[in-house]
């Protein structure tokens, strides 16, 4: 059985970890970084870039570079959040899919579901794990914000499937962080508050870590959060400030210039990071735009105090869910023994200060906020694989679940913060005499009014025998699995007739959609490999042309005019081949040049050996090695290519 990898699929960055023996280890990506930007770009040449490569070219390709896609996953286009919070904040097109979901589109008009885009990030994680382990990887534990609803969890599983991964478990991010902390912690019973402020979402979970018969039991007592509060909002606040200041100075509004906007966005993110250790920073963007008077440069000094004033309301917004989580757990602030900070945004001094003020204790600094979640996911993978045996994890459902009953009321079957997996049943009846069918409308949320909650789906239980209203007994059962995904059934107790569905969002992706996206992803993987191989062949050819011409020049009169002409002709033919897309033609012309150059090289080395006199025997070995000079040059090009 292969490894079950742990993936923190973040809004801004993602992280990968595996179990290495008894400990979880974060794996570096191909670029040597421990986190990967959750950015996917589609280039004009048809190449798909993921991670740092995609982020680097965002300024010149804003329409086709997709970031913060996690904020769209599992959401409807008409959601207030999508219309007000997301569409206005991203340079790429957010469109309405046929099923009502929020999708994205490239400038060429290619439409994609958010899980399809997220799958590209997961594919990179999968490839990184396979390169490290030297074996195929097919299973993963993927984390989601604790406050993700059923649709968002299902969409995350879909993304895994499209990427070629069987998602063995969806685990809440704060729970994963507590797992990472709890497994290393041997300090007896603790009540831990996990404050998780990431790139796009905020979660707070109150978690009890205790020793039960030698096992580390990690039980989530309550969770709360805000799926529209994160580091991206901090970036945006600073970006808008910079744009407003520039407008005051120059009278030009950069909001309508996508290229300039992307540059300011990146500068704002960089300045935000710099203002954690430093008291002030300069944002300097030369040639940001131009008007009739010439080019304009943006140069603005930002102090930490100014930045804090811009985002203080965002930090304060995170404290209300903290209060609710404590109330739901039935605890006071003094009951909390440890506070863990998770998510890159918690590096901000103001965040640390406000969290300390709220809980009345210093947050722990020994947990890596970027990596703890992935480490926890890997540990959960180890538990599922049977490699980690002394850990028991008890998570909760973040939102109440129920059905719509007479008068448009939501009747809750499972209250929020119920430990999962769980199963609850309740008997309902008909509202009319001789009612032949009932519609079960499944809801998620905390409001009394059914229409104010999230609709997860509907299904009908038909063929109810005629009877006066209130007589038939319809048993509705809600069953939540360990991933927090819901299965609902309705049964007529008189006839035994039953109807059930696994709840997806009322839109969501069908199995056919997912299968098509899996095939697209596999086709892209093949196309990506072909593109990579073509680039490698071109680089090899370019390098050989360069080294051949250089050698001819250095050998001078030792090479005849006919030989020079033959080499030059072979170089020109190879150059022509590299301008095309035929890898085999490039390789054939490369071989032809190597063969043309080989006799000249041998003759030159033989002359060198003769000149060496008595040391000829020793020197003769070196020319043999020198025959591999082309290979050594190839490796230099490989480095460049990376």
Swiss-Prot record:
Xref: Pfam families: HSP70
Biased composition (Acidic residues): 628-642
Induction comment: By stress conditions e.g. heat shock.
Phosphothreonine: residues carrying this PTM: 201
InterPro entries assigned: ATPase_NBD (IPR043129), Chaperone_DnaK (IPR012725), Heat_shock_70_CS (IPR018181), HSP70_C_sf (IPR029048), HSP70_peptide-bd_sf (IPR029047), Hsp_70_fam (IPR013126)
Region named Disordered: 609-642
Alphabetically ordered keywords of this record: ATP-binding, Chaperone, Nucleotide-binding, Phosphoprotein, Stress response
Gene3D superfamilies named among the record's database cross-references: 1.20.1270.10, 3.30.420.40, Actin, Chain A, domain 4 (3.90.640.10), Substrate Binding Domain Of DNAk, Chain A, domain 1 (2.60.34.10)
MF terms in GO: ATP binding; ATP-dependent protein folding chaperone; unfolded protein binding
Family the UniProt entry places it in: Belongs to the heat shock protein 70 family.
Role according to the record: Acts as a chaperone.
Name listed for the protein in its UniProt record: Chaperone protein DnaK
Annotated source species: Francisella tularensis
Gene that specifies this protein: dnaK
């Amino acid at each position: 059985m292969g490894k079950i990898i742990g993936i923190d699929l973040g809004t801004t960055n993602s992280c990968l970890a595996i179990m290495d023996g008894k400990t979880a280890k974060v794996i570096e990506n191909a670029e040597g970084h421990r986190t990967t930007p959750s950015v996917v770009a589609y280039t004009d040449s048809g190449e798909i870039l993921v991670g740092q490569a995609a982020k680097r070219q965002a300024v010149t390709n804003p329409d086709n570079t997709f970031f913060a896609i996690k904020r769209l996953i599992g959401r409807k286009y008409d959601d207030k959040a999508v219309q007000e919070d997301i569409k206005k904040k991203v340079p790429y097109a957010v469109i309405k899919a046929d099923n009502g979901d929020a999708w994205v589109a490239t400038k060429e008009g290619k439409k994609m579901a958010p899980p399809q885009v997220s799958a590209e990030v997961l594919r990179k994680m999968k490839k990184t794990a396979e390169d490290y382990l030297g074996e195929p990887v097919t299973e993963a534990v993927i984390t989601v914000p604790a406050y993700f609803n059923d649709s968002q969890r299902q969409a995350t599983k879909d993304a895994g499937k499209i990427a070629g991964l069987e998602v063995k478990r969806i685990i809440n991010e704060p729970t994963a962080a507590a797992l990472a902390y709890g497994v290393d912690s041997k300090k007896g019973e603790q009540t831990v508050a996990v404050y998780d402020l990431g790139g796009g979402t905020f979660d707070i979970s109150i978690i009890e870590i205790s020793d039960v018969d030698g096992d580390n039991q990690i039980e989530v007592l309550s969770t709360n959060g805000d799926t529209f509060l994160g580091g991206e909002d901090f970036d945006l606040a600073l970006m808008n400030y910079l744009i407003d200041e520039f407008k005051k100075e120059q009278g030009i509004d950069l909001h309508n210039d996508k290229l300039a906007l992307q540059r300011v966005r990146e500068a704002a993110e960089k300045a935000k990071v710099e203002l954690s250790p430093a008291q002030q920073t300069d944002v300097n963007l030369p040639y940001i735009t131009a008007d009739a008077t010439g080019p304009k440069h943006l140069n603005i000094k930002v102090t930490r105090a100014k930045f804090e004033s811009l985002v203080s309301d965002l930090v304060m917004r995170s404290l209300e869910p903290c209060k609710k989580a404590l109330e739901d757990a039935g605890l006071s602030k003094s009951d909390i023994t440890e506070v863990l900070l998770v998510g890159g945004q918690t590096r901000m001094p103001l965040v640390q200060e406000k969290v300390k003020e709220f809980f009345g204790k210093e947050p722990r600094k020994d947990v890596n906020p970027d990596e703890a979640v992935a480490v926890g996911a890997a540990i959960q993978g180890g538990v599922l694989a049977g490699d980690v045996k002394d850990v028991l994890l008890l998570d909760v459902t973040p939102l109440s679940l129920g059905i719509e009953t007479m008068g448009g009321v939501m009747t809750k079957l499972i209250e929020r913060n119920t430990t999962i997996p769980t199963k609850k049943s309740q008997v309902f009846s008909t509202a009319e005499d001789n009612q032949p069918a009932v519609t079960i409308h499944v809801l998620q949320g905390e409001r009394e009014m059914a229409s104010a909650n999230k609709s997860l789906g509907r299904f009908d239980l038909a063929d109810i025998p005629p009877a006066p209203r209130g007589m038939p007994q319809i048993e509705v059962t809600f069953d939540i699995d360990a991933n927090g995904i819901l299965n609902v059934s309705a049964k007529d107790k008189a006839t035994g007739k039953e109807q059930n569905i696994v709840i997806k969002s009322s839109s969501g992706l069908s199995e056919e959609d997912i299968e098509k996206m899996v095939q697209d992803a596999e086709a892209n993987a093949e196309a990506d490999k072909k593109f990579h191989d073509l680039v490698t062949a071109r680089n090899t050819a370019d390098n050989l042309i360069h080294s051949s011409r250089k050698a001819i020049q250095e050998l001078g009169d030792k090479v005849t005019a006919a030989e020079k002409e033959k080499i030059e002709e072979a170089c020109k033919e190879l150059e022509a081949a590299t301008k095309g897309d035929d890898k085999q033609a490039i390789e054939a012309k490369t071989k032809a040049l190597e063969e043309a150059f080989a006799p000249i090289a041998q003759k030159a080395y033989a002359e060198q050996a003769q000149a060496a006199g008595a040391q000829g025997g020793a020197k003769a070995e070196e020319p043999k090695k020198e025959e591999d000079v082309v290979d050594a040059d190839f490796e230099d090009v490989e480095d460049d290519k990376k």
